[in-house]
Amino acid sequence: MKFLGKLILWLLVALLLVIIGAWFLLQTHWGARQASAWLSNGTGWQVSFDEMEHDFSSPLHVQLRNVTFGREGKPATLVAKTVDIGFSTRQFSDPLHADEIVLNDGTLNLSPHSADLPFAADRLMLRNMAFNSPETGWALSAQRVTGGVSPWTPEAGNVLGKTAQIQMSAGSMTLNGVEASNVLIQGKIDQGEVTLSTLGADVARGTLTGNAKRSADGSWRVDNLQLNEIRLQSPASLAEFFAPLTTVPSLQIGRLDITDARLQGPDWAVTDLDLSLRNLTLSHGGWQSEDGTLSMNASEFIYGSLHFFDPILNAEFSPQGIALRQFTSRWEGGMVRTSGNWLRAGNALVLDDTAFAGLEYTLPANWKQLWMTPLPAWLQSLTLK
């Protein structure tokens, strides 16, 4: 029995020495190469790192240096200077679900094809990372990203998972061609519904703040959005500029405020624009509202041959149509003023009060052709009282 006991003891000591030796070997360049090859072999993924570090003061954390990870034969999904992985007792039941993954100083490229990653974490932390998400409908690229996702359970078609809390900041970001800097995002994802409880950024030399919610079907509800001192030049015509609003199934605007904006396109421009819009829903090329309002004024508005100075517009929206409470502007050396109603039934515009004073207007050479041009679909009749 003594011999058997000593044999078991020596076997345990030998096993412990092998484990300790393997542990130290893994922290060498040779060991890192061997571990990378073992992790990549037959998995469909390509993993490489130069060195693994472990500190007994943090026994449940392992740090990998100069990490590259991605599908075999595809561009790398992750390139990072360091990756810190925190473990917990959960590894006994779910070895690929970490307590925490911290990515430092690198680039994370996520697409629907790479989203079905073989691991997850209670927390994913990004520190000074670049983030690219092509082919997802968002066309997102961000630099100097710091923040986190909790929990992080990626799956095919859902880069961040179906349920998560999000808090991130970015030094710069491009989303669907729109550039921004000093971006702050806080919110959550819940079964395809995205809630942005805090949204802030510097955009087009101005600032953007607000909150919004995106439904699983792609509809948006903007509870509050403020744009201040925007300076934007666009290559798009006015119709093309607003075209993205028609691509979503529904856009519900609770409150939109624009202050001191200057916008310019190839055949249109507006300067010193102040706008306040309340309770309006855009859907399928139309609009709906129960008690919406619009107040707008500017120093100058240009659209084609039309050139208005100091235009002021106040209107109210209802299921029956639009009540034009006030429209005044300086135009062609004079003044124009009107009020009335646009009626949804029959697409009829009824002007109650219209006045022109001091105009100096020359008809264009093709005025007869313009006169014979059919009215747009939303304006089937015009009545002056």
PLM features per residue range, with description:
Residues 45, 74-76, 136, 204-206, ...:
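Short acidic/polar mixed-charge low-complexity motifs
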Residues 61, 66-68, 123-130, 160-264, ...:
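Small-residue helix/turn framework positions
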Residues 132-145, 264-283:
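Short, solvent-exposed loop/hinge segments that bridge or flank secondary-structure elements
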Residues 87-91, 151-153, 281:
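Outer-membrane beta-barrel proteins
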Residues 19-112, 175-180:
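Terminal hydrophobic membrane-targeting helix
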Residues 91, 111-116, 212, 340:
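Short, T/G/N/S-enriched strand-turn elements that build extracellular solenoid repeat scaffolds
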Residues 1-17:
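N-terminal Sec-pathway targeting helices
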Residues 107-153, 164:
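Non-cytosolic head/periplasmic domains of membrane-anchored proteins
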